[in-house]
């Protein structure tokens, strides 16, 4: 891709005002001209999703980033509703459902536990790669390229310098999200 990829950052946090980590991560994204930050809870507080509008946003972008906290081994309720309604059969899957084919999917996740909690012998009993498998499968169903997720573990307990480092790396990636040679 010779021009800068257009990124749609779907942000889903029901208590965004209380999430220091997510606010810090969003700052570089909000300063980049190739990134559209779309706060789902701000747009749809009543959960009535404008499906045609959302599908058009997806069509207009090359890379779709799903930024959210890990809630009960998944995503917040509004994002789950969004996934179920917007990524509909005939649009992104099934016969004729090729609107997202070839686009890129990246999950950017914040957690309340340390990385060590995501092991077979630890608190959550499964590694993050297993927990995120439904998202990876959804990307495959949509014929999208799954990109390695960015995970900020123990987000609430991150020191400001560590959060700033994550935000800097995230911003640099958002500025040029598609690796040379495709995926």
Curated annotation (Swiss-Prot):
Keywords: Cell inner membrane, Cell membrane, Membrane, NAD, Oxidoreductase. It holds the Pfam family Flavodoxin_2. SUPFAM superfamilies: Flavoproteins. InterPro entries: Flavodoxin_fold, Flavoprotein-like_sf, K_H_efflux_KefG, KefG/KefF. The keyword Oxidoreductase applies. Its main location: membrane. It is found in: Cell inner membrane. This is Glutathione-regulated potassium-efflux system ancillary protein KefG. The gene is kefG.
